[in-house]
Every structure is written in C-alpha cells, then in structure tokens.
C-alpha cells in the first residue's frame, strides 16, 4: 500500500478545489442539486452505511452492547470514513441528521477519500496532532464546498442567468439545496473570492450542468 507523507503544514486549498472539480467531471450526472448519493454509487470501493446499519454490524461482534451504546463510541456525531481491508472504505453517516447535514457530511467524507487522507503516514513535522487534524478537516471542507456547489458554476448562474435578481444566499439554498448555515459559509467565501473563478479552464464544468 502506498503511504503519503506530508512534508509541510500547508493547507492544500487549491488541490482540494481541483480534486473536487475533477470528481464532478468524472462522476456527476450534471443535475442540480448535486447528489452525493449518486456519486457514491459510481465508486466501487466505498460502502455507504447509516450509523444504525454499521452499529448493527458491530453488535454481532459485541452482543452485550446496545445499538445506542455502540453509536456513542463513534468518533463523530455526523459521519466518518474508515478503511475496510487494503483497498475498500466504509463511509458512515448519522441518518438522524437533516438531509442538508447528511449531504454535507457525505461530501466532506468524500473529501477525505479523494484527498487520500487515510493513506497518509504521520509525519513528525506535525508535532501538534490537533494541527494535523485541523489541516485535513479544512481540506475536506474545501472539497465539500466546491463539490456541492462548484463556485465557477455559482458565479455563472448568479451573473449570467440570474442577472443578480436572486440574493446570493438564496442561490446557494435553492439551486444547490443547502442549509442556511452552509449557504452562508459558501456565499461568504464566494463574496470574497469570486474573481478567482472567472477563468476559462472552468468552462467544462459549467457546460456539464
């Protein structure tokens, strides 16, 4: 198995964005809002499970524990990605969350998958483990932001189609099916960095949708 080793503590925002657009071009069906469930179905080595489904599997090995007791041991209240053998993965999400949170969670965990965070070997340059985890979380969030609402497409829709009639926050909520919280997160980033997304290399992405 190839292990990736980080040589610095830089957050690879550009790489996460680039990878998100590559994933959309390869796996998306070009329909809005972008459906992470449909993307996962096209990835052969990821098994998608709810928290309850995964807890029931684990209960077979730990029959003395209840489903809820097992869930309490999960590393996150939202979702997580785990390796299963050498080449397969399990992506679990909390089915009790709203559909908005579930979608974001899956995009986020797909970020960990496509950015190969689970293949990384711990590097001693990260003496602070919290900093190392923070970097990976920010990269996964960056991937999720661009994969769930590709900003070159948002810019095109906002300027060319919408003609600025719809508020930016509402554009993210209605066209990309995001919660108010995530819409604010994406629209704030968009407002600050929108000029960065006016480039011809994104034409294929816009054409896809």
Question: Language-model features: where?
Answer:
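Active-site hotspot residues in diverse enzymes, especially metal/ion-binding acidic/histidine motifs
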Residues: 1-209
């Amino acid at each position: 198995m190839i292990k990736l080793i980080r040589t610095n503590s830089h957050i690879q925002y550009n790489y996460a964005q680039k990878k998100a657009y590559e994933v959309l071009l390869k796996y998306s069906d070009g329909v809005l809002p972008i459906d992470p469930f449909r993307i996962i179905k096209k990835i052969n080595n990821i098994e998608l499970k709810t928290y309850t489904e995964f807890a029931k599997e684990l209960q077979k090995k730990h029959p003395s524990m209840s489903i809820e007791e097992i869930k309490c041991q999960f590393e996150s209240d939202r979702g997580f990605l785990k390796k299963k053998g050498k080449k397969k993965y399990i992506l679990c999400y909390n089915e009790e969350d709203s559909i908005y949170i579930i979608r974001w969670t899956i995009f986020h965990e797909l970020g960990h998958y496509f950015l190969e965070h689970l293949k990384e070997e711990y590097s001693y340059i990260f003496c602070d483990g919290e900093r190392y985890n923070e970097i990976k979380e920010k990269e996964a969030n960056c991937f999720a932001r661009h994969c769930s609402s590709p900003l070159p497409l948002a810019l095109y829709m906002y300027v060319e189609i919408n003609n600025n009639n719809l508020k930016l926050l509402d554009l993210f909520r209605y066209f990309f099916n995001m919660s108010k919280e995530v819409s604010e997160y994406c629209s704030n980033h968009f407002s600050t960095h929108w000029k960065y997304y006016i480039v011809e290399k994104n034409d294929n992405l816009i054409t896809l949708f």
